[in-house]
Amino acid sequence: MAGTADAVAAAKRAAGYQAAEMVEDGMVIGLGTGSTVFYAIECLSGRIRDGLSVVGVPTSYQTAMKAREYGIPLTTLDDNPVLDLAIDGADQADPQFRLIKGRGAAITREKCVASAAFRFIVVVDEAKMVKKLAGVVPVETLPFATKTALAQLRGLGCRPFIREAVKKDGPVITDNGNFIVDCQFEEIPDPALLEAGIAAIPGVIESGLFTRLTGNTTIIVGNEKKCSVLTSPDVVP
């Protein structure tokens, strides 16, 4: 796939639209955060106009605003603690269906929603598929304990930085009122072990490593011409 912006957008659109076609009438679905998911929302809007009945649980204020704009009815995990499926993007995905997520700073709600779903549909363009996870792992932290968390995160072999906002001074604030620490790892030999190690640090709310949902994950990889659907052996089609 050509690396142009138009080609990437076409790949994301193809993946998002294919995910939306997997939604069945009467489903309660999780709606992730990010540009690829917004294409799924766009497609769902058209299907709703054609008579599809569906309600969504958004993972961020941004997604909630987009869903309302496109006429998708919304609900909450309080009212629907079990979801039929969830659709979300990823920054990286490896052959074992382990993910790094979190550029949209919604990792805690995304992980809650994905964990509540019978099936987790991950939509990516082919550049997001990697042989091994590495690079930046976002971590959501309590502001009160961020400095102490930084020291312990360094002990796990990374270079952590508090994410700075782009259009305002100061750090990025999540929808939960917390900070995002971006942790740069040169390599991640054992993603599941690292996810557990990060989670054990006091003050950490959640990390962008998703390693415990591989059994119910389907990855839709988009490119300009077609989509590839990768299904975990543990998923029942």
From Swiss-Prot:
Binding-site list for substrate: 33-36, 88-91, 101-104, 128
A molecular function (GO) term: ribose-5-phosphate isomerase activity
UniProt entry keywords in alphabetical sequence: Isomerase
Pathway membership, UniProt: Carbohydrate degradation; pentose phosphate pathway; D-ribose 5-phosphate from D-ribulose 5-phosphate (non-oxidative stage): step 1/1
Gene Ontology CC annotation, any one: cytosol
Protein's UniProt keywords contain Transmembrane helix: no
Domain of life according to the entry: Archaea
NADP in keyword set: no
EC number of this enzyme: 5.3.1.6
A GO biological-process term: pentose-phosphate shunt, non-oxidative branch
Enzyme superclass (EC): isomerase
Chemical reaction(s) catalysed: aldehydo-D-ribose 5-phosphate = D-ribulose 5-phosphate
Residue positions of the active site: 110 (proton acceptor)
Pfam families linked to this entry: Rib_5-P_isom_A
UniProt-listed HAMAP family: Rib_5P_isom_A
Function per UniProt: Catalyzes the reversible conversion of ribose-5-phosphate to ribulose 5-phosphate.
Family to which this protein belongs: Belongs to the ribose 5-phosphate isomerase family.
Subunit structure: Homodimer.
Name used for this protein in its record: Ribose-5-phosphate isomerase A
Organism: Methanoregula boonei (strain DSM 21154 / JCM 14090 / 6A8)
